A protein has these predicted regions:
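Acidic, surface-exposed loops and disordered segments
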Residues: 1-243
Length: 243
C-alpha cells in the first residue's frame, strides 16, 4: 500500500481477532520502534509487553478497555524512562539535578511517543491494527505497582496491536489550512470552528456504528469540562521528578 494512503486511512482498532502475534513479528515491531528519532540519542523510553493474564485484566479494568487490551495480539506499555540515565550518572558520581527537571521529562515523553508511533506505522503497514490506551494513566500508582516501575519513569500510554476483527470509519481531521501556519501563529476563526463542527456533526450522525448527536466543540467541551487525572503531579514527585 502507498504510505500516504496507509496513513490517511488510519483508524483506531478496538476489536481484535484473538490470534497472538508471532515472536518474529513482535521483534520486528520493537526494531521498528527503536528506529525512530531520539533527542541527542538519549533513547529515553522502555517498552513493556504485558503477557500475564492477571496484569492484563487489571490494566483492562483501570483503563476501561472493554476487551481491546486483553484480546489484542500483543499489548505494550510505553514508559518514559530516565532511570537508565540516572544509573549512568550515579555510576560516575554525578548529580541528578539535570535529569529531574521539566526539559528532561519532556525529552523522555517525546522520545517515547516517537518510538510508539513508529511501531504503529509499521504495524499498520503489515496489516495489523493498533489502539493507543491513554487510560492506563487513570491510576498511575497502580500501573507503577503492576509493572514494578523504578524512579524516573512514567507509564505514558499503552498500545494494543493485533489482527483487526473490524475497522472503524476514518474520522475527518481538521482541514489542513486550520493547522498550518506561516511565520506566526494564527488562531482559528469562529467560522473555521463552525465549519468543522458541521463536518463532524455530519460524521457522527452518519457513521454506521455508534451514531451520535455530537460535533467537535461538544466533544472538546466535555473533555475539558474539569481537570482530569489530577494525581499526575503527585505521581511525578513520587517518581523523583522536581518541576
Amino acid at each position: 500500500m502507498d504510505l500516504l494512503k496507509q496513513l490517511l486511512s488510519h483508524t483506531s482498532v478496538r476489536k481484535f481477532a484473538k490470534d497472538k502475534l508471532s515472536p518474529r513479528l513482535k521483534n520486528q515491531l520493537l526494531c521498528a520502534a527503536q528506529s525512530g528519532s531520539s533527542s541527542n540519542f538519549v533513547q529515553a523510553y522502555s517498552i513493556i509487553e504485558v503477557t500475564d493474564p492477571q496484569k492484563l485484566a487489571a490494566i483492562e479494568k483501570l483503563a476501561n478497555g472493554f476487551g481491546y487490551i486483553k484480546d489484542a495480539g500483543a499489548f505494550y506499555v510505553f514508559v518514559a524512562d530516565l532511570n537508565k540515565h540516572a544509573q549512568i550518572l550515579t555510576q560516575h558520581q554525578q548529580p541528578l539535578e539535570a535529569l529531574k527537571n521539566e526539559e528532561s521529562f519532556i525529552v523522555s515523553v517525546v522520545d517515547t511517543t516517537i518510538a510508539a508511533q513508529t511501531m504503529a506505522v509499521y504495524a499498520e503497514s503489515v496489516g495489523l491494527g493498533i489502539c493507543y490506551i491513554g487510560g492506563i494513566r487513570n491510576d498511575l500508582f497502580k500501573m507503577a505497582e503492576l509493572l514494578e516501575l523504578p524512579e524516573y519513569t512514567f507509564p505514558l500510554f499503552g498500545l494494543s496491536v493485533g489482527y483487526p476483527a473490524g475497522k472503524n470509519e476514518v474520522k475527518p481531521r481538521l482541514p489542513v489550512e486550520d493547522i498550518q501556519h506561516t511565520d506566526s501563529y494564527q488562531p482559528l476563526s469562529s467560522q473555521q470552528i463552525d465549519a468543522y463542527d458541521q463536518l463532524m456533526e455530519d460524521y457522527y450522525a452518519g457513521r454506521t456504528t455508534n451514531a451520535a448527536d455530537a460535533d467537535w466543540s461538544k466533544k472538546m467541551l466535555a473533555h475539558f469540562h474539569e481537570p482530569r487525572r489530577t494525581h499526575t503531579t503527585e505521581f511525578l514527585k513520587k517518581q523523583g521528578f522536581e518541576f
